[in-house]
Amino acid sequence: MSNPSSSGLGSSSGLTHFGIGLANTVQSEVTPYLPLPSLPIFCGAAEPGEFKLFDEVGQGSGYRSLDRSEILAQSSRIANMLHETDVSYLDLRNEARAPDCNSGEHFQLYDLVLRCNPGAFEYVTPGPTCDPLFTNEGPQKIISEPSVPVKMQRQTDTHLARSIEPEPVKRVLRPNHVEDHSWQHETLTNQSPKDVTAYDSRPETITMNELSASKKPKGKKKRKDDLSSVQPDPSVLQESIVQNFCEMLEDFCGRAEVPGDDRDEAEWSSVPVDEVRVLINELMTIRSKMLLHMVPVDILSRLLRTLDHQIHRAEGLSIYSEHSDSDSVLLVLGALESIHASLAVMANSDMPKQLYKEEIIERILEFSRHQMMAVMSAYDPSYRTGSKPAENLAFEGDDDDDNPDHDMGSASKRRRIVKNSKVKKASVNRISGAVNTALQKLCTILGLLKDLLLVERLSDSCILQLLKTSITTFLVENIQILQLKAISLIGGIYNSYSQHRTYVIDEISQLLWKLPSSKRALRAYLLPDEEQRQIQMVTALLIQLVHNSTSLPETSRQAASGNSILETSVDVGYLTKCHEAATETCCLFWTRVLERFTSFKGQDASEIKLIIENLVMDLLTALNLPEYPSVSPILEVLCVILLHNAGLKSKDVSARIMAIELLGTIAARLKRDAVLCSKDRFWTLLESDSEISVDQVCTKDCTFCLGKRAGNLLVCQICQRRFHGDCLGLKELDISSRNWHCPLCVCKRQLLVLQSYCKTDTKGTGKLESEESIENPSMITKTEVVQQMLLNYLQDVGSADDVHTFICWFYLCLWYKDVPKSQNKFKYYIARLKAKSIIRNSGATTSFLTRDAIKQITLALGMNSSFSRGFDKILNMLLASLRENAPNIRAKALRAVSIIVEADPEVLCDKRVQLAVEGRFCDSAISVREAALELVGRHIASHPDVGIKYFEKVAERIKDTGVSVRKRAIKIIRDMCTSNPNFSEFTSACAEILSRISDDESSVQDLVCKTFYEFWFEEPPGHHTQFASDASSIPLELEKKTKQMVGLLSRTPNQQLLVTIIKRALALDFFPQAAKAAGINPVALASVRRRCELMCKCLLEKILQVEEMSREEGEVQVLPYVLVLHAFCLVDPGLCTPASDPTKFVITLQPYLKSQADSRTGAQLLESIIFIIDSVLPLIRKLPLSVTEDLEQDLKHMIVRHSFLTVVHACVRCLCSVSKLAGKGVSIVEHLLQFFFKRLEAQGSDNTQIAGRSLFCLGLLIRHGNSLISTSGGKNFNLSGCLNLFKRHLRTEDIALKVRSLQALGFILIARPEYMLEEDIGKIIETTLADEANGRMKMQALQNMYEYLLDAEKQLGSEKASDNTVNSVEQGGHNVPVAAGAGDTNICGGIVQLFWDKILGRCLDFDDQIRQTSLKIVEVVLRQGLVHPITCVPYLIALETDPQEANQKLAHHLLMNMHEKYPAFFESRLGDGLQMSFIFMQSISQVTSEPNQSLQQKGSTNMLGKNDHASSTLTQARLGVSRIYKLIRGNRVSRNKFMTSIVRKFDNPTWNGSVISFLKYCTETLALLPFTSPDEPLYLVYSINRVMQIRAGAVESNLKALLHKDSAKTQHGNGAYQQDPIPGHMNMMDLNTRIQEEPRHWNSYGHATLIDLNGSVYQDSRDQFTSYQVHNGKADVHKMTSSDPPELSTDDLQKIQVDCLAAIAIQLLLKLKRYLKVTYSLNDDRCQAYSPTEPLKPGDPLSRQSVAFDLSETRTDLPSTYQDLVQRYQEFKNAMREDTVDFTIYSTNVKRKRPTPRKTSRSAKKTVAYNEDDDDDDNDDRGWHGGGGRGAARRLNYSTRSSNRR
């Protein structure tokens, strides 16, 4: 009895195995046997005498007896002081010494203090602000295994001890004892004696850490033996205890009852709180000894009745009220204690049913609910303010059931309520001790209510009230402990009352929306993890509910022995049903949540989406933690729902977007876990990978850490595996030197025992004493072994409660579902759950593993779950979403895929992902394409294999239309090259990047230059330590980059792109503007130039090295190096003239001129070498004489004999340079001139090849030797004779010789441009540029002009730089002065203007090359400013429609520059440009058609549908006009002028052969303009209305007059009417029948045309009228049958022609107007209210419908009979009637030049310009068929409402 470590168990020995929980309560029976608290009785004083209990100071020193009378008299005072004492500052846990009062002596003072206050020796928090309090427990050192964060249902097994908690935040201050803290395991939390905090009302997270599972079994056994030797007979002892307890109960009830005859309510006295607490202690004691059911029922009934009266006395009072006093508070506390006592009786198992009176239970629930509301108001001021107006109604019954959205208005409204309350949160330390005590008691009450659910089935009303009250706690802050109890209670209800599960889920989903925004995502639930992660309380509740949805089988609830498992018959499908129940819970919850999301829009939908995202993030945080197996199925069900109609297949775009985001987040987590498992091949994965025997070949390393740690290894005696003790969480003292078995073998043998047990028919005790006689070990799979290790861990760290049982059961349900053969092993699964009950040797089920190892096991097992296996399904659906029509969905899907890729970049190597991502490279949205590239680009550096796979598709994006996409593609390829020095596609990558050096966007050009600067020209860090060879001074890295440059040039078609790179690298002009403004660093410039010089030197060395190879191979190998050197010389020849030896390059390369190779490669090599020498010569002062002579001879020889003229050209130029440098004058040049001149005179044109070569060389010698000839005075050479010779050869019949003569003439004109001003030369040039000239002659003439302009431009540059030339050569003769902008003031401008019209005419030639050369001439002319830019605008606009992409781009570039510099000029010629584009389009179409096919009216009408080439040409033309419109779209005035100029073409069209086709072309062009704002189509409708207002009435009157005039004429016959041939003298006629005679002009395709004063070209009217003689493809002009109707006379036909043309133009405009109104949803009111002078409305959206525009059914041929004329009139009248309302509002303003539409009344709108058939007019467009006589519906049916069609 005096043993300090005694457990105090005075019951039978059968109870000693389990232990009674002593936490937070005082047990009267065992109190004398327990040591006093570690807090000394003198309350922390340094010396005992310093504690002044009395007024006088204590005498003496040392310890005096505490049982003195004067001290005993102060017991009540001591009790009060202890109650109010704050011991939170004491280190109670680590107290080293035990006070002397811990001896076996029993003090009388102790009993007296307990009588005054049973909780005196329990420490409590004085206020919510204090720090957590800890118990002082000795055995903390042996606590090693973390516990399961659980709160489990009470077991109903009558053979097990029960532990009921009174006040959950108190700690009994008793050292050196082991407490059973099972009551304290809240749902899903981890708490331990060392970590559990006292109640903390602050809003911070509550601490839920590890729970010790150490039970000190040896100490318990010893105590049991000691006690058993002195204990009396158990039955006698039980009777004695029950008898004493009954007497105590009678005494308690007697004190509460007032003696009297009547037992009214008023005659019950109030019992002090302390007495009720003493009663509770006694109840807990008798209950823990499992003797409460032995108390007579009448005594218990009387007790419950007495306690019920105590509760009844406090009804209506509140623990927290403004008017509450101390008496009220005591009554409330007494009532709460009475509830505690009542529930302690009723919640006990096997109690008589007479005790469970519904009246008492309802009063308990109602009073508890009321006090919970008061406590919540006290702890959360915002809740108190929000609930105050309805304080008495908020939770009364189900009053709010009629309004399910009570307090569920918009989230913004809820935020305003909280914000406007302006209630400052009360400091937590203000909360009274009474409220704190009440809160603690309410937590105890909720725990007992959960126990009550297991022993008594409550009514539905009670259950619903409990649920509503418990769920309400989640709306309040600072009461996290109460919320934990509520979670446990709700879980118990959910498990036991399945009929209310739907209601619970509904309430939880409602709770999510009711939470104020300030309390959402408040993560106060601490996970049992060392990382201290938290989740929301609501998430924890959801997890608990899913756990509790799997009801435990009765065998696991009631079986006291393992044998009962075999005896109880259970449905083999029970596990499946449990899993289905969990799935149903998940489905119900997510369905409710997602339904709420789809029912809201706007801000509320955004907040609901945020709630869902927070839930998912919480679940992912708890995923794969061993205590939360339900997280996986919760997320799995969510994914299944999101993959179907509620997510990706929903019609709601927002729902699909949210589904994509959530699925991407979840899939990324799955992939991240999979990567973790694949990288860390720890032993659990090795054990669970395959389903083979557990036995494994032993290794030298630790099976767990695989050798990552150091230390002594333990060897398993069975499998010989090795383990570190630290890896298993074992200490050296715990390790047995013999017969040590690893966890794998232990679990394997355990499973074999369970299998054998399930097969046996033994009906004995049900427990196996050993694991012997085990056979067939191969039946156990590796996965089962690892699973059992997890189950053992959960059972070891679990409490006496059954939460760990639920968790283990849930795991078994999941595993049962995933194993196909498990249906035959149901009892085996039950046995695994009850392994400890079956196997008596508890050591066989003890888990040795640390928590880290268990977490790894959980992760490994999770990878095999159906949830993890669903990753591929999620990924496939996300990839499918990349093909959605909506760009925002595609962008979100791409973002989701990118999150997955972030988790594992190797996903990009998946073929499915690669195809999907590459498909997004070609997405229609620029943002999606850029995002797809960004996805790949982020992982290029870290995963080179990804770059190789995607290189080809990324390279294609370098040509993307989006600037940002092109730039991103360039950066990605740059990263591929820099991150991988051995990148196999480096040369191809450089070639792709180099192709963008000519990009239209300057920023892209700068990026390309910067990229190559980083590749080649940037100085690398550090010093050069490695060189190409011993004799070389070239660094090795520079040699490598030079080779890269050589390889790149071999992949490019020409050197120009590389030349641009080198030029800009030398200038460093690609840096940002800020860097340019600060000035380029001269050091950087010098560094680049030095590297370029070294590259040239390296190239020269490579050329010398290749020279040693054979001749054939040498040419091929040396050519790339020479070409790169050529490129450097093109930029700056000074790079090849080193200061140490300027002639080095000339002397080194000169021997190559002796090559006899006659191949194209050899010719290219010679040409480049000659150019390099020619470039360097002007920079050299003097060459050695021998070198000069060799050069002259070699060049002369090649000029005479080389077969490639390009080499000859280079030789002539170089020879002239050598002659200038050598100072020999013109001697050698004149010699060659005489040689070729005499050869031409002697042979003439007999030998075409020799003559052509002579002409070519003669012209070149004159061009390049002009300065030498001029210096010598030309005494020995007759230039006039050469000109005459060239003219003579121009008159030959051989076209090749004529072209060569024209080329030679061009060479002379370049040297002597003044000759072009002579009349005969001018005629030659005009003739060769004429339409009818031969194509080769036109091409050569243009080439001559182009070379002349380039040469003039070059001379201007050389003259400017002549002062800096090393050796200036005097220029003689006639130098052509060219100054940009000088225009006509110099000879160059005069020459260009002389032939400008001819050059512009060639811009529209049907030959592609001729157009391209002409356009280049225009570019040079505009650059030099030689002509007025307005003259070429129409031609450039026409070339925007060129089928050749190069011509399109150059024309567009020139137009862009012109629009920036001369916007007025540009806009004034847009209309003419449109007409020119139409002429050009017709020219191109006709050239490709049949040669003899005439241009027919019907053919041109059906041009879009009949001729594929014509259709593509027209489409190209309209696209070109659209590009032009985009240039001016930003300026309102400019775009309005453009549209007005086109609409005016319909105002007064002049009849010619192609006028109708042109009007249709204009109509389609206007219809397809890329409008971006409503102002644009509105202005076009406005312009159309103006034309209609002026012309429609007159045209109708003229047509009607013609009909009345000829009404007497009759028609007969029904054949096809054909018109007479139009007389040949018919000329162009306008609408006023004036005949126009225009000068004739021949166009390029041979037809006579007419040019008006504006330069517009029209076809001759006679050609057009002739074309109309063909009708329906049959030429039947002169054949007329007798049945044909009377034809129109010539005079009538002339009049009808003008009016019908005007009618056709108006009908086209009406059709365009109708199309605009339907496409852009423009109604009548909007069109009529529009005014072009009104300011634009910013942000006005433009809605556009996809409607095709078709003019194929519009009749545009002329009427040939009066019947046709009547039909045309009727069609025109119908079209006018349908559009009457739109344009008649302008009738009142006809006289105004610029009518301004204004809002008028409907009556005003009825005023019409024509009066006939007004009764048929209506205000809508019903029955719009357009073609009155035909009656057929149009192909486009604008079946919208009338208000939307105007």
Swiss-Prot record:
Stretches with biased composition (Acidic residues): 1811-1820
UniProt feature, compositional bias: Polar residues: 185-194, 1837-1846
Keyword Metal-binding: yes
An example Gene Ontology molecular-function term: cohesin loader activity
GO cellular component: chromosome, centromeric region; nucleus
PROSITE patterns, A to Z: ZF_PHD_1 (PS01359), ZF_PHD_2 (PS50016)
Expressing tissues: Expressed in leaves, inflorescence and siliques.
InterPro entries named in the record: ARM-like, ARM-type_fold, Cohesin_HEAT, Nipped-B_C, Scc2/Nipped-B, Zinc_finger_PHD-type_CS, Znf_FYVE_PHD, Znf_PHD
Positions annotated as HEAT repeat: 243-282, 298-335, 438-460, 461-499, 532-572, 613-631, 632-672, 781-818, 869-906, 945-982, 984-1021, 1053-1097, 1113-1152, 1174-1213, 1227-1267, 1277-1314, 1427-1464, 1475-1512, 1533-1575
Bias type Basic and acidic residues, positions: 175-184
Keyword Endoplasmic reticulum annotated: no
Domain of life: Eukaryota
Keywords carried by this UniProt record: Cell cycle, Cell division, Centromere, Chromosome, Chromosome partition, Meiosis, Metal-binding, Mitosis, Nucleus, Repeat, Zinc, Zinc-finger
Annotated localization: Nucleus; Chromosome, Centromere
Annotated stretches, region: Disordered: 175-234, 390-414, 1790-1846
Disruption phenotype: Defective embryo arrested at preglobular/early globular stage with the formation of giant endosperm nuclei. Suspensor overproliferation phenotype preceded by ectopic auxin maxima distribution. Reduced sister chromatid cohesion. In conditional RNAi plants, sterility, arising from several defects in meiotic chromosome organization (e.g. failure of homologous pairing, loss of sister-chromatid cohesion, mixed segregation of chromosomes and chromosome fragmentation) and leading to shrunken and inviable pollen grains, and degeneration of the embryo sac.
Biased composition (Basic residues): 1790-1805
PHD-type zinc-finger residues: 699-748
Family: Belongs to the SCC2/Nipped-B family.
Function statement: Essential protein required for cell fate determination during embryogenesis. Involved in sister chromatid cohesion during meiosis and mitosis. Forms a complex with SCC4, which is required for the association of the cohesin complex with chromosomes. Plays a structural role in chromatin, especially in centromere organization, chromosomal axis formation, and distribution of the cohesin subunit SCC3 on chromosomes.
Quaternary data: Interacts with SCC4 to form the cohesin loading complex.
Protein name: Sister chromatid cohesion protein SCC2
Gene behind this protein: SCC2
